[in-house]
């Protein structure tokens, strides 16, 4: 009976939110998901809602059958941006690598892929199938990957040498596959002063013709007394971002204008 009622409501144009089956029953979705989906429905008719693709999390590549190399990223920033943009009515597609956290509600369009080559292939596919109007590159992509050894490298060896090869840069390939779009990059550095950080962000904008770059330092991420990040646009204007909530709001304002 419930299925028939839900089907009838859907056919009449109602938006029905159904949770996954748990313990043999379909229970009420969490309040967080209900609010998120309602916000998306309410805001999707606002002007300048966009199709947005975002990469997030870290890459991982094998050293041997049991060991691997990865970049530092929990995925917190990428998930937070994705959730915020979805609630604001945008159509969001996430390409997620390895993350320590998951979104607070089920985002409708998520692909998980951890290896840098596979992530790039997925992003290129999405460039044609989803045709993003905006790309946000927040993933910590491996710049180098090892040539994996067959089996397990013996732990009795006193030292090992690992040969690493450079990976293909994701941003130019993805933007070339997408065509005209608004693009935001991320630049994470460590033990560097602000002037040098902004110089590196500016170089990234010039190299890839990005519209803006979010620059931050590893040592600032968990320091409540430090800014969360700085944003630099293609005109050279920079500004401080106090926290993650502000970061999400600033990105949305750039996209929606």
Model region roles, listed by residue range:
Residues 114-187, 194-217:
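Glycine-rich phosphate-binding loop
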Residues 14, 90-91, 179:
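Short phosphate-binding/catalytic loops that engage adenosine nucleotides
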Residues 35-52, 84, 116-135:
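Short amphipathic alpha-helices and their capping/turn segments at secondary-structure boundaries
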Residues 1-23, 27-38, 182-212:
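Short, glycine-/small-residue-rich phosphate/pyrophosphate-handling segment
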Residues 15-50, 218-257:
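Glycine-rich phosphate/pyrophosphate-binding loop and the adjoining helix
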Residues 70-84, 153-173, 207-211, 240-254:
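Gly/Ser/Thr-rich active-site loops/lids in small-molecule metabolic enzymes
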Residues 20-23, 97-100, 140-141, 188-189, ...:
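Short, ordered loop/turn segments at secondary-structure junctions
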Residues 7, 49-115:
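Glycine-rich phosphate/diphosphate-binding loop of Rossmann-like nucleotide-binding domains
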